[in-house]
């Protein structure tokens, strides 16, 4: 593929609810533009964009894919994003690389939660928005019902461009409201002009909707509209184009991807409606001092690019997908990674069509491509010229709120699992992985059950590692509520030097996260040189509480008496004596189990606020407050025991149909209710006996 100036490059992110047909629309475009020699079908597992084995198996996109086409002198970079909520990280990546968002809507199912979330993501990224109502060959499709829902949901900016003429449930004639011409589609994508169908007042009403939208783009056109004067075709084209670019108009196209009906009309309009990479304007980055810097889409400027996606595959190697904002990226252009501060050597650059790689001389300003073998570079990094160091905006990923413990099927493979999950997290930064040294578990977090299920599948398919998920353990604590004194006496005689240590220690509650050690020994009952050994013995002992084996916190231990033997006493004997004092005394100090409490901030629609508050109470939580967040959304703040939050991500998604989200973080420890504590203690004892 030849190189294009940024003025002739369009970067389009395809988004929408799962199953709306966005990948099918993209495949239809690739086929029409001869970028693919077949019309890929998801059901057949032969699409260009859903090429991953997991995508083929699940018949759904789970990661962002890229494919460029050439259409009437314009390069269009298609960025296909996932529709499943569990893979929303891919949407964030796609929106970061795009200048326009095409939101695909099912003609049968209409506007869904995924439609709303796609619009929200596009708005957050500041992108131009367009709609495509797909699947109109389905007899259950209802274009005009869907169109009215789009207008009522997203406002008067929604403007029809191409509409179907439906007879007996069949939509093979489409009217372009710009040129007021009709086109008839037949088998194998055949298309021919046809007479305007008799659609009664509907057609004129749709045409009037365009005029109203155009009138809003300038005072001059508004005056003309109010005076009842007709717009010229040129004024309509310019008005709509301006309105689309400034966001006051969201054009609606339609068709059927499986039959390639009206796809050409969308492409023809796209070339003059969508803002080019150059037209989007400059990005604002920051320099080394944190000061804002304008980075313009200029082919002759210093290089600056954002890495918006990473592939780390054991078979094809590592690929970093980049959107070049300024300058160009090529093997002869030196760049540095602004996160690491180190230079990155570029051996070659690629154009990606799904998984197919094609060498290219360079990736120019406004364009998208990939760089192989950048080992230290991660998604979200900025690559730029050392002559002009700048950090571009990264990627705002959704919070990974669903956590599970991960165990290898084969004992001893823990390191293999950790390394493999780390590589998967390089590809998908919404995968979080930590080793909890307290519970001795590896914990993996993601966006939902299906997300982590894919992780398990990929561990097997990519790295031949079998692993399983289970509910993570909770890091409880133990403390005391009563002051006691206890003796620890250790004596061992077995020929030669023996072992002797004797201590009296006072234990009492104290405001500390671990152990406060003190001494008030008089008369040398315990020599000072053994004090550190006593403290060490206690610090080792508190790692395992007397109730359920959890660490003991909030305790002060004061060494106040004891005895020693001038020959047999040693650091080891006093260390052991201290641990015996702990074991003898703590059971009498009213030991108490503590549970971790977290702060919950749930953002949900107004209609779900009562459900969420009720669920918080059911989970032993306390609602701390509520506040409106605008647009019919409320933020519920609460404190909830961490033990009750394992499946909260699933609950909030189900109750809000995917509209809700939440953040949850540890706050403090509190006394565990007696009935809950008893279950925890019994479970700990049962595990210890296994």
What do these predicted ranges mean?
Residues 1-690:
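Structural and coupling elements of P-loop NTPases
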């Amino acid at each position: 593929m030849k190189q294009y100036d940024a003025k002739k490059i369009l970067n389009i992110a395809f988004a929408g609810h799962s199953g709306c047909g966005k990948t099918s629309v993209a495949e239809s475009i690739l086929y029409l533009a001869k970028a693919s020699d077949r019309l890929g079908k998801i059901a057949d597992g032969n699409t260009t964009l859903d090429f991953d084995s997991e995508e083929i198996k699940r018949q759904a996109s789970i990661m962002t894919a890229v494919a460029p086409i050439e259409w009437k002198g314009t390069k269009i970079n298609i960025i296909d994003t996932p529709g499943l909520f569990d893979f929303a990280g891919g949407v964030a990546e796609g929106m970061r690389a795009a200048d326009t968002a095409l939101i695909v809507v099912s003609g049968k199912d209409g506007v869904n939660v995924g439609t709303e979330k796609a619009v929200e993501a596009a708005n957050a990224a500041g992108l131009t928005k367009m709609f495509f109502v797909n699947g109109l060959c389905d007899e259950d499709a209802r274009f005009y019902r869907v169109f009215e829902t789009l207008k009522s949901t997203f406002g008067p900016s929604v403007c029809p461009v191409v509409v179907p003429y439906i007879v007996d449930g069949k939509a093979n004639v489409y009217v372009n409201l710009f040129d007021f011409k009709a086109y008839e589609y037949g088998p194998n994508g055949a298309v021919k002009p046809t007479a305007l169908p008799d659609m009664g007042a509907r057609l004129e009403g749709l045409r009037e909707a365009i005029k109203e939208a155009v009138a809003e783009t300038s005072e001059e056109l508004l005056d003309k509209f109010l005076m009842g004067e007709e717009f010229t075709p040129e004024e309509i084209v310019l008005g709509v184009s301006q309105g689309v670019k400034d966001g006051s108009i969201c054009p609606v196209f339609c068709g059927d991807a499986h039959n390639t009906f009206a796809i050409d009309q969308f492409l023809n309009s796209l070339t003059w409606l969508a803002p080019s990479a150059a037209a989007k304007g400059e990005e604002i980055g920051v320099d080394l001092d944190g000061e804002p810097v304008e980075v313009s889409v200029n082919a002759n400027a210093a290089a600056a690019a954002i890495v918006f996606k990473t592939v780390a595959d054991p078979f094809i190697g590592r690929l970093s997908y980049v959107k070049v904002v300024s300058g160009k990226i090529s093997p002869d252009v030196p760049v540095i990674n602004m996160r690491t501060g180190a230079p990155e050597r570029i051996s070659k650059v690629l154009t990606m069509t799904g998984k197919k790689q094609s060498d290219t001389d360079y990736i120019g300003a406004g364009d998208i491509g990939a760089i192989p073998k950048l080992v230290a570079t991660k998604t979200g990094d900025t690559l730029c010229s050392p002559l002009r160091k700048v950090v571009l905006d990264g990627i705002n990923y959704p919070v990974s709120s669903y956590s599970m413990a991960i165990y290898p099927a084969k004992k001893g493979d823990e390191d293999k699992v950790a390394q493999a999950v780390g590589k998967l997290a390089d590809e998908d930064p919404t995968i979080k992985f930590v080793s909890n040294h307290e519970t001795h578990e590896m914990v993996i977090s993601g966006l939902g059950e299906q997300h982590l299920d894919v992780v398990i599948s990929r561990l097997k398919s990519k790295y031949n590692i079998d692993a399983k998920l289970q509910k993570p353990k909770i890091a409880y604590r133990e403390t005391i509520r009563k002051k006691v004194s206890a003796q620890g006496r250790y004596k061992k005689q077995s020929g030669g030097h023996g072992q002797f240590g004797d201590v009296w220690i006072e234990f009492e509650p104290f405001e500390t996260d671990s152990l406060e050690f003190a001494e008030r020994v008089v008369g040398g009952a315990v020599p000072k040189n053994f004090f550190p050994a006593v403290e060490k013995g206690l610090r080792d002992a508190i790692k395992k509480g007397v109730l359920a084996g959890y660490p003991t916190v909030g305790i002060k231990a004061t060494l106040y008496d004891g005895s020693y033997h001038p020959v047999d006493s040693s650091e080891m004997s006093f260390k052991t004596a201290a641990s015996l004092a702990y074991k003898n005394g703590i059971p009498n100090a009213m030991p108490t189990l503590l549970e971790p409490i977290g702060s919950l901030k749930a953002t949900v629609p107004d209609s779900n606020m009562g459900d969420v508050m009720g669920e918080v109470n059911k989970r032993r939580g306390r609602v701390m407050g509520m506040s409106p967040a605008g647009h019919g959304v409320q933020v519920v703040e609460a404190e909830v025991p961490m033990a009750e939050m394992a499946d909260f991500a699933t609950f909030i998604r189900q109750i809000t149909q995917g509209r809700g989200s939440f953040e949850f973080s540890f706050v403090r420890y509190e006394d565990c209710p007696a009935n809950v504590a008893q279950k925890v203690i019994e479970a700990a004892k049962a595990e210890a006996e296994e």
